[in-house]
Amino acid sequence: MIRLCRDDERDAIFAIVNAAAEKYRGVIPADRWHDPYMSREELDGEIAAGVAFSGYEDGDGQLIGVMGVQPVRDVVLIRHAYVLPAAQGRGVGGKLLAHLTTETSERILIGTWATAEWAIGFYRNHGFVQVTPELKDRLLQTYWNIPERQIATSVVLAKPPFE
């Protein structure tokens, strides 16, 4: 079942994000890796900035995947899409993404690490198109609040694609 996460589920969101983000270790630039990947303070800041997390519950009512949305001006950003490693490959991420993308008529943008080929492939398989490097820089500077180093090492995918 997919539902909005409750405020008292921040510990579960934190655990899912950091368990799944272990896949980035040694893949993303070393200067961008943190342990934990997302601190509790960063999670609280993301929620305060308007990221609304939805979660996927297993049959026992436990969250096994989370994905956030953040409306910013004229687009919606998909933020922090993570599924527990033991639950990956079972369609959880795809179901979350499909659910969240049907909730808006705005263009949807997703930023991820340029070296996270599995993530890029996942989004492409769900109809997202990677934008040009020039447009990527402009979009990341306009819609995200991230350091220049992260802009340089990221990609953006869009749906619908830019003409």
Model-based region annotation:
Residues M1-A15:
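A short beta-loop-alpha structural element at the N-terminal edge
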Residues N18-L43:
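Conserved GNAT-fold acetyl-CoA-binding loop/helix
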Residues M38-G55, Q150-T153:
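A short helix-loop-beta-strand connector motif used in the catalytic cores of GNAT acetyltransferases and
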Residues A81-Q88, T112-A114:
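A short, internal acetyl-CoA/4′-phosphopantetheine-binding micro-motif in the GNAT/acyltransferase core
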Residues A87-H99:
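Conserved acetyl-CoA pyrophosphate-binding loop and the N-cap/start of the following alpha-helix
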Residues G94, T115-Q150:
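Conserved active-site alpha-helix within GNAT-family acetyltransferase domains
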Residues T102-T115:
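Conserved GNAT acetyl-CoA-binding A-motif
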